[in-house]
Structure formats: structure tokens, C-alpha cells
């Protein structure tokens, strides 16, 4: 698969994307200035692959501006709590394997 990391999206960048991962603090409650922000504009949502999955690392608050935008444009969205859970599960699997093999 082809992976592309970008700092700034061009107008039509999301037309061919299958997944968009928000790794910015925009939408989070880390600072007041981030809270009501989104990494994507309404114009970008109008030029987006309708089958894209948007994965947001933000999990506080649970509902962000990005999540509402996705809902309004019928875009699949997963918030940061799920990503955090996936990471915790993977870490648990790794550490469990280490402990099982420790005494051998």
C-alpha cells in the first residue's frame, strides 16, 4: 500500500485517500485554543473520498468538531479512545508473550 505523510493538504488530496489520521492536537482539550478546531475545513470535506476512514487520535473530549463534520458528511470516523484501546491491547499481547517466555 502507498502511505503519504503531509504537513499541509492540497484541495484534492483527500479524493484518493482511503484513510486520514489526525495526529494533531486540534479538537482536543489540551489547550483552550485547540478545543473547537478541526484539521479539515468544510471545503476539504466537499472534496473527499466518500469511503474514507477518518481516525482521530483525540479522545478528550469524546465528540470533537472533526467528529461532527464527519457525521454531517456521512464519513466513517473513529475517535482516539479506540486507537488508545488498540495500542493498549497490542502492548498487553507483547508483554504477555514476554512473561510467558521469561521462565523458559
Where are these regions (language model features)?
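Rossmann-like adenosine-cofactor binding region
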Residues: 2-77
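Active-site capping/gating segments
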Residues: 59-62, 75-99
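A short, charged, Gly/Pro-tolerant segment at domain boundaries
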Residues: 102-104
Amino acid at each position: 500500500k502507498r502511505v503519504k505523510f503531509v504537513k499541509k493538504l492540497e484541495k484534492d488530496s483527500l479524493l484518493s485517500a482511503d484513510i486520514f489520521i489526525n495526529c494533531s492536537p486540534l479538537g482536543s482539550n489540551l489547550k483552550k485554543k485547540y478545543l473547537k478546531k478541526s484539521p479539515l475545513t468544510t471545503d476539504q470535506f466537499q472534496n473527499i473520498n466518500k469511503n474514507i476512514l477518518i481516525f482521530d487520535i483525540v479522545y478528550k473530549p469524546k465528540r470533537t468538531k472533526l467528529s461532527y463534520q464527519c457525521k454531517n458528511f456521512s464519513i466513517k470516523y473513529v475517535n482516539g479512545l479506540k486507537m488508545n484501546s488498540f495500542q493498549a491491547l497490542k502492548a498487553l499481547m507483547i508483554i504477555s508473550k514476554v512473561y510467558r517466555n521469561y521462565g523458559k
